[in-house]
């Protein structure tokens, strides 16, 4: 337990920030999983493109605001772009 008032405040702030960071990263994981799920399910190209757009927007936002490292955001965007460009839905 903190002994000083300022240390107590820092503890509260850290807890709030930790919760916020976890929520943002969880949102990102959901968006990325959604795109991967659409690719695995052999969805229409337009659906995958919409998921790609949402994922790139989320990555850009989190990279700029430093929730994730900007280079990680850039790397993930490149991976998603490559997956989208190589994606061709097969008739099943």
Swiss-Prot record:
Highest taxon above the source species: Bacteria
Start and end residues of each stretch annotated as Disordered: 1-26, 73-92
GO biological process terms held by the UniProt record: translation
Family label: Belongs to the bacterial ribosomal protein bS20 family.
Record field: compositional bias (Basic and acidic residues): 1-21
Any GO molecular function: small ribosomal subunit rRNA binding
Job description of the protein: Binds directly to 16S ribosomal RNA.
Comp. bias (Polar residues): 82-92
GO cellular component: cytosol; small ribosomal subunit
Protein name: Small ribosomal subunit protein bS20
PANTHER family per record: 30S RIBOSOMAL PROTEIN S20, SMALL RIBOSOMAL SUBUNIT PROTEIN BS20C
Keywords linked to the UniProt accession: Ribonucleoprotein, Ribosomal protein, RNA-binding, rRNA-binding
